Amino acid sequence: AHSAMIKGASQVFVVDNHPDRLKLAAQMGATPINSLEKEAVDQILNLTHGKGTDRGCECVGYQCCDRHGHEANHLTMNNLVASTKATGGIGVVGVFVPQDPGAKNELAKEGKMAFDFGAFWFKGQQIRTGQANVKVYNRRLAELIHHGRAKPSQIISHRLKLAEGPDAYKHFDARDDGWTKVVLKPAA
C-alpha cells in the first residue's frame, strides 16, 4: 500500500481479514477491505463505481485461503481479474511454487491453479510476476526515506533479540493479533 501511494496511486485498497492489518492499512491512508464481511470484489467495484482498479497486486501467493480458512491458491488471482479494470495491470509478488505436494487439490499439487483466463483475456489485462529487483529501487527508496517521504518501518510491529526468533515465528505464523512484521536483531 505504501509503495503504491509513493508511486502516485490516488486510492489504494488493502484486502485482508485480520483487523490489526486492516487498521494499519487505514493508518497508512489506504481503504481497508475486510474480506470476511462481504466479497472483496463487490466492495472494490462498489467503491470504484463499477470501474475496478487501474492496477492490482497479488501479495499472498499459493497459500491463500478462502473465508473458511481453506487453502485456495486461485482466489486472489481470480479476484484481481474481476476487480481490475479492462486493460489494467496485475502484479504478482506473492510466492507461487512449481509444486506443492501438501496441497489439497490436484492442480495445486502441480503448482497450477484454476485461473479465469477467459475474463483476463477479454479484459485485455496484463500480468507481471517475480521477485522485485531491489537493486533497481534501493537507492531511490533510501533517498525517499532520508527525506521523510517513505517510512517502511511503520509496518514493523516487533523488534526482538535473535534468541526470541522461534517464539516470534510462532506468533507470526498463527497470525496473532498485532504481529505484522518482525525484525530480529542478532546483536541485541
Pin down the residues of each PLM region.
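Glycine-rich cofactor phosphate-binding loops and adjacent beta1-alpha1 units
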Residues: 7, 23, 28-124
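Short beta-strand element of Class I
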Residues: 10-13
